[in-house]
Swiss-Prot record:
Gene: rpsJ
Keyword tags: Ribonucleoprotein, Ribosomal protein
Cross-referenced PROSITE patterns: RIBOSOMAL_S10
Residue ranges of coiled coil: none
Tree of life domain: Bacteria
Species in which this protein is naturally found: Nitrosomonas eutropha (strain DSM 101675 / C91 / Nm57)
SUPFAM superfamilies (UniProt xref): Ribosomal protein S10
Name used for this protein in its record: Small ribosomal subunit protein uS10
Record InterPro entries: Ribosomal_uS10, Ribosomal_uS10_CS, Ribosomal_uS10_dom, Ribosomal_uS10_dom_sf
Subunit structure: Part of the 30S ribosomal subunit.
A Pfam family the protein falls into: Ribosomal_S10
Length: 102
């Protein structure tokens, strides 16, 4: 697998989970002899929702909620077969979405 790179994109609502997962991936890749660029924090996406507090009156009284989606980007350059096998066996937390591109 020479002259290749694996791009890993992590997405989660909790920044602690995503940072812990990124450290795990970097340690695993470095242990198997690959070069890692990142993790690079991408802009956090914030979705805000306004909900009426009362079902009947008081239009000006509202609750505000938000969801923050945190993103991290990593590149693994010149991965070996051991690197790919180790990344496949890696057990990450349930709240982290992993997107891998070769």
């Amino acid at each position: 697998m020479q002259n290749q790179k694996i791009r890993i994109r992590l997405k989660a609502f909790d920044y602690r989970l995503i940072d812990k997962s990124a450290v795990e991936i970097v340690e695993t890749a470095k242990r198997t002899g690959a070069v890692v660029k990142g993790p690079v924090p991408l802009p956090t996406r914030i979705e805000r929702f306004d909900v009426l507090r009362s079902p009947h009156v008081n239009k000006t009284s509202r609750d505000q909620f938000e969801i923050r989606t945190h993103l991290r980007l990593m590149d693994i350059i010149d991965p070996t077969d051991k690197t790919v096998d180790a990344l496949m066996k890696l057990d990450l937390p349930a709240g982290v979405d992993v997107e891998i591109k070769l």
